[in-house]
Amino acid sequence: TNPEDTGIYNPNIEEFVKLIHEAGGLCAYDQANANGILGVARARDAGFDLCHFNLHKTFSSPHGSYGPGCAASCVVKKLEPFLPKPVVVYRDGKYDLDYDRPQSIGKARSFLGNVQVMLRCYAWIMSLGADGLRKVAELAVLNNNYLLKRLMELDGFELPYPKGGQRLEQTRYSLDKVFRDTGITGSDIRRRVVDYGIQSYHESHFPVIIPNPVTLEPTETYSKEDMDYYVDMFKEIIHDAYADPSLIKNAPEFGETSQINEDYANDERTRAMTWRAYVKKNGSKV
């Protein structure tokens, strides 16, 4: 991704792409963080061969409580024959499905995807137009830097890579100071957020290179009042982490679901996302 999940845009991206191309490779671009660069920078301008746009966040659509996601994939001309089939084409005055694609990689799961999300995004994009999409990016960056400034006023939030400075549409913070002082982890604090009527945030992708991470992405849609409430929530949670650590350790207090055994959930020997996988791993125990 570029900007990276730290919220920092890497200005050397064209040089990276050039080196890969010189070695005979192809470059793919995960546009998960395009919310802050719509109408400002394009994957094509950096020389990428393939990219995808997540419809959640960037195009103002729900992620569905961490899934299912939905995306639009874009490729350069030389990769077009390999796109999944069927492909929607326009011929003889009407739209049709083209299955005659001998070099295609075949179907990629359900062909239609999340239709309702795609229609919602299409209407949103068409209603905004090119100028409106650029405005979306500008507001997303503005919101994120306002939230960043407010959170850095709290004792407990740290900003690594590098310290200080602005970010684009998201920021990865560290709550390691709170952990060092109280033993309360970033995961403990994430669970406590639920008690304030807010969906818990994304901590970090793996590997975790920032200790006790917090990744916040306010986007363009949140008001100043929303973000101020969010900051006040963190201020109160951090205060409680020092004053009454057990309150945070046992969170969520009001959540419908209590804490789960994350070690069990993350163990490859037991984790099963489907019934078929569960049966395969448990065998005669089922």
Model segments located where?
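Conserved PLP-enzyme active-site core in the AAT-like
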Residues: 1-96, 103, 183-184, 211-212
